[in-house]
Amino acid sequence: MAEITSAKAMARTVRVSPRKTRLVLDLIRGKNVADAIAILKFTPNKAARIVEKTLNSAVANAENNFGLEKANLVVSETFANEGPTMKRFRPRAKGSASPINKRTTHVTVVVEEK
């Protein structure tokens, strides 16, 4: 049986738009875990907090479930897929209304031993 060298964590239905989350994920893809966490700490963005939490969860999964070393881990894959959209309406003049889409995201972070 092949040895497991990667671990994954997901955050589902997070109240941040996927487009904004992808901007943050592009910053950390391919970096080692320590650098990625440092980058996320100094990114002034709601999505950065969520991605940081998910990354820490993936690292914990790697250490506890698969016995991998934190120092050897690299962020190999990150993606943000669209979750369910909450549809709301904003009242406008003359009895009309404009739609508001409150988007959610499914964030996935995969760490791999280099």
UniProtKB/Swiss-Prot annotation:
CDD domains: Ribosomal_L22 (cd00336). Keywords: Ribonucleoprotein, Ribosomal protein, RNA-binding, rRNA-binding. Pfam families: Ribosomal_L22. Coiled coil: none annotated. One of its GO terms (cellular component) is cytosolic large ribosomal subunit. The keyword Ribosomal protein applies. GO terms for molecular function: rRNA binding; structural constituent of ribosome. PANTHER family: CHLOROPLAST 50S RIBOSOMAL PROTEIN L22-RELATED, LARGE RIBOSOMAL SUBUNIT PROTEIN UL22M. Belongs to the universal ribosomal protein uL22 family. This protein binds specifically to 23S rRNA; its binding is stimulated by other ribosomal proteins, e.g. L4, L17, and L20. It is important during the early stages of 50S assembly. It makes multiple contacts with different domains of the 23S rRNA in the assembled 50S subunit and ribosome. The globular domain of the protein is located near the polypeptide exit tunnel on the outside of the subunit, while an extended beta-hairpin is found that lines the wall of the exit tunnel in the center of the 70S ribosome. This is Large ribosomal subunit protein uL22. It comes from Streptococcus mutans serotype c (strain ATCC 700610 / UA159).
